[in-house]
Amino acid sequence: LTKKAHENDIKIGFDCSHSVGVIPHNLDKWDVDFAMWCSYKYLNGGPGSSAFLYINEKHFNKEPGLAGWFGYIKEKQFDLSIDFQSAQNAGGWQISSPGILGCAAVEGSLEIIKEAGIENIREKSVKMTSYLINLVDEVLGRKPYNFSIGSPRDSSFRGGHVAIEREEEAYRISEALKKKGVICDFRPPNVIRIAPSPLFNTFYEIWKVVFHLKRIIDNSEYKNFSKDRDEVS
């Protein structure tokens, strides 16, 4: 994508929120112009934790469209100059002071990720998502369950989560799953998204998710939940 974009004189950036922390990245090697990502998914920062921004060094001299005092040249931030001088790196796109509590959580998580190694994390992630896909196929792929997989079967095209699809009652089934302590989400029109985290989830927990889904259908437990969607699903 980057190569084709540059061949047509197009700047290209990527949202890496669903890949950072579970997939290796080499943004410099790929010559990506910019990228951004949150830290509350696989980086385990929690709600409100800091966002991150990558800027290719060839764009360090660009003037940020939205400037803030924290993007000023770091060694002169407190000079209170009238003229804005952007830091000549990704820091030039910072706007204000980062939240310290959110940063603290991310710092601890990054230390664990570094110790584990992103290649090892990716290897376990592929095994976990493949295991989940195989279980859904074997246990839930027939009537009356009627679940299917929406994610790519080829792991090289798959990220860290698996989209489990069901034409009917996917939302209420996801709510029944949450009631059993499974953190999942629903995406219209028919997707239940499961995202095992290699750092702390286990294969046994994946097995439990699939058999929770089986029991939810066997016992019609989803009927205990409203069809009206919450604002956050």
Model features per residue range: what roles?
Residues L1-F34:
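Catalytic PLP-binding core of fold-type I/II PLP enzymes
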Residues G13-D15, M36, G150, D185:
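Structural detector of well-ordered beta-strand residues that form the stable sheet scaffold
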Residues H18, W37-S49:
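Phosphate/diphosphate-binding loops
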Residues N44-S49, Y54-K124, S130:
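Active-site C-terminal subdomain of aminotransferase-like
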Residues V126-S130, D137-K180:
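Conserved PLP-binding catalytic core of the aspartate aminotransferase-like
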Residues E168-E169, A176-S233:
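PLP-dependent enzyme catalytic core of the Aspartate aminotransferase-like
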